[in-house]
């Protein structure tokens, strides 16, 4: 027995008291000052009994403390005391119980979510008073107060002494293995033995075994049936039509994101719209609800015919392309005779109008039987880089072109098609064959039909 330095008789009006999160006995009556005093004394009693229980079970730290009890709202501690022992009385035992939400395995090995499961969290009787019936007295008082049954209780990490106690006094021997530290006995999931309202251990259950939780699966697929009749209900549900399941789902209105509106099946609308003729024009399944049987090949063939008809209605014959008539090739113009006009006096540069000379005449002079181009040649085609500056065109060499300039006749003047053996005359003579006047037009040709090559003396060339 555990004795304290203060008198425990005012706290224990009866041998077994019940303490909740307020740390006051259920039989306590007093003012504010007495409440504070009683709270401090109950804190010391609970902490010392919890430490003795942890030492007896070989735990590193106590499971039961006054601070944990104050922070919880679903735990209760039952204390057993002897007011006649010693001078101030003595506390003999402790029993802590509560409710927990657990995932448990049933006899068939299926996982079940059980809410508000009755749990035995800590049980201790002083070694000097064991095997005297005090533990059975304390445990039975708890069952009567909580309206539980021993078979419906789960035990958290029971010791060998506690297992022997339950086997001796309540006949609990066959254990259902669990993945957690809790121990269940056979009959825990059997609702037939529930004695009273809270004895079944399922606060959210009903007498017919219907188990409803806040899980999304409950909103989507309906409630879960527990107990022995679960297999019978499962077999009967498989034999019923799917409409019963749909009716069960619609009865429980989903909430949250599970209650959002889902889009209808577009393929079903296409099939029903293809089957229904254009009488109603809504494309729904009302036209086909009478027979209920849809011939899929006929529907597919009908859709294919409809698509082909739409394509034929929208199709059109392309107009034949008209091939362009080939343009007649221009006949080659005869080369005009080159008439050399009388040259003006030397060193006279009189510009000739552009209408006097044409590019066709200039190009016919250079080369053998050259024809005028059908389009205007650019300097990318001809390589005549300085054509746009009007200083002359590039020299196009041919077999009839000679460069015989022994002496300086005039600046930038080269005679073309000079007959062989022709001697160069002096600048003082009247050489009409050698002198030419540069025309501003005509593509850089002189009046005699020569190419003005003075751009070769330019530094930028």
Curated annotation (Swiss-Prot):
Organism: Drosophila melanogaster (Fruit fly)
GO aspect biological process, one term: behavioral response to ethanol
Amino acid composition bias (Polar residues), ranges on this chain: 233-254, 426-439
Domain N-acetyltransferase, chain residue ranges per copy: 2-189
Family membership: Belongs to the acetyltransferase ATAT1 family.
Residues carrying the site annotation Crucial for catalytic activity: 57
Name of protein: Alpha-tubulin N-acetyltransferase 1
One Pfam entry name: Acetyltransf_16
Lineage: Eukaryota, Metazoa, Ecdysozoa, Arthropoda, Hexapoda
Function: Specifically acetylates 'Lys-40' in alpha-tubulin on the lumenal side of microtubules. Promotes microtubule destabilization and accelerates microtubule dynamics; this activity may be independent of acetylation activity. Acetylates alpha-tubulin with a slow enzymatic rate, due to a catalytic site that is not optimized for acetyl transfer. Enters the microtubule through each end and diffuses quickly throughout the lumen of microtubules.
EC number(s) stated in the UniProt entry for this protein: 2.3.1.108
């Amino acid at each position: 027995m555990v004795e304290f330095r203060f008198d425990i008789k005012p706290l224990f009006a009866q041998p077994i008291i019940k303490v909740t999160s307020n740390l006051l006995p259920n039989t306590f009556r007093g003012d504010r000052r007495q409440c504070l005093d009683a709270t401090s004394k109950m804190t010391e009693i609970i902490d010392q009994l919890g430490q003795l229980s942890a030492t007896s079970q070989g735990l590193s730290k106590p499971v039961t403390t006054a601070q944990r009890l104050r922070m919880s709202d679903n735990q209760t501690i039952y204390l057993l005391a002897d007011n006649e022992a010693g001078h101030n009385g003595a506390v003999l035992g402790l029993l802590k119980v509560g409710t927990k939400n657990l995932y448990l395995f049933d006899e068939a090995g299926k996982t079940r979510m059980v809410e508000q499961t009755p749990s035995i969290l800590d049980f201790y009787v002083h070694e000097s008073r064991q095997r005297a019936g005090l533990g059975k007295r304390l445990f039975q008082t708890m069952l009567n107060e909580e309206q539980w049954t021993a078979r419906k209780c789960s035990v958290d990490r029971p010791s060998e002494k506690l297992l022997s106690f339950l086997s001796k006094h309540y006949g609990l021997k066959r254990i259902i293995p669990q993945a957690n530290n809790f121990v269940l006995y056979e009959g825990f999931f059997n609702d037939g033995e529930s004695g009273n309202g809270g004895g079944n251990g399922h606060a959210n259950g009903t007498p017919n075994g219907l188990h409803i939780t806040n899980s999304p699966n409950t909103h989507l697929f309906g409630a879960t049936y527990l107990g022995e009749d679960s297999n019978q209900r499962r077999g009967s549900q498989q034999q019923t039509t799917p409409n019963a399941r749909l009716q069960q789902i619609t009865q429980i209105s989903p909430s949250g994101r599970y209650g959002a509106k889902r889009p209808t099946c577009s393929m079903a609308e296409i099939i029903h719209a293809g089957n229904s003729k254009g009488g109603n024009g809504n494309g729904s399944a009302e036209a086909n609800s009478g027979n209920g049987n849809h011939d899929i090949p006929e529907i597919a063939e009908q859709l294919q015919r409809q698509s082909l008809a739409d394509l034929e209605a929208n199709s059109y014959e392309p107009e034949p392309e008209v091939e362009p008539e080939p343009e007649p090739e221009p006949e080659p113009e005869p080369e005009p005779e080159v008439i050399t006009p009388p040259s003006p006096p030397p060193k006279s540069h009189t510009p000739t109008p552009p209408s006097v000379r044409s590019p066709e005449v200039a190009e016919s002079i250079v080369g053998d039987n050259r024809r005028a181009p059908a389009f205007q040649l650019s300097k990318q085609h001809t390589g005549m880089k300085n054509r746009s500056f009007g200083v002359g065109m590039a020299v196009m060499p041919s077999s009839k072109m000679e460069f015989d300039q022994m002496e300086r006749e005039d600046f930038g003047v080269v005679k073309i098609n000079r007959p062989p053996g022709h001697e160069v005359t002096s600048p003082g003579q009247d050489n009409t064959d050698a002198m030419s006047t540069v025309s501003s037009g005509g593509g850089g040709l002189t009046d005699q039909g020569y190419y003005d090559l003075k751009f070769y003396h330019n530094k930028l060339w």
